A protein has these predicted regions:
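Compositionally biased terminal segments of proteins
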Residues: 1-159
Length: 159
């Protein structure tokens, strides 16, 4: 599990390694990692959830991460004791349902070497967390995260 400082360290290490190897990647990140980086929650996260990368039409689905990135993620995971899947595209299928309109205009971009991490605005994270919280109990981390976002009735209806 990674606290905010450890998460920043891992991303900085990954960005520096990509830069050293002459590679770059831009990732749209959701989930607990994005909430932690934005300071919405204090709970640690197990991983970074990548759903997409910038494209000419907004964000494309990141269902398969490029080999150079997978290798760098593995190397950083080994070096920092995070395991090989600490940065993954597990929830990329959310893109198939459609991203919130205007999301690309509202992201916050954090740069770590040649790695850009795109963090959705809180209103967009409400959409993702509402989706994740469906069919789960009030004790789930997704439900707790949704409560931390404190969405308005309008945001919930839009989500």
């Amino acid at each position: 599990m990674m606290e905010r400082e450890r998460l920043d360290e891992a991303l900085a290490t990954l960005g520096a390694l990509l830069q050293e190897r002459g590679e770059h990647f831009n990732a749209l990140v959701i989930g607990g990692g994005s909430l932690l980086l934005l300071g919405v929650v204090e709970r640690p996260t197990a991983d970074i959830d990548v759903v997409g990368y910038p494209s000419a039409t907004g964000y494309a689905k990141a269902d398969v991460l490029p080999d150079f990135l997978v290798a760098a993620v593995r190397d950083v995971g080994d070096a920092l004791g995070l395991g090989p899947a600490w940065f993954n595209s597990g929830p990329a299928g959310l893109v198939d349902f459609g991203l919130p309109p205007g999301l690309a205009d509202r992201v916050t971009v954090r740069t770590y070497g040649t790695l850009e991490v795109h963090l959705p605005a809180l209103e967009d994270l409400v959409c993702f967390k509402l989706y994740a919280a469906v069919d789960l109990t009030e004790r789930s981390k997704h439900f707790t995260d949704l409560q931390a976002l404190a969405p308005s009735a309008e945001q919930l209806l839009q989500a």
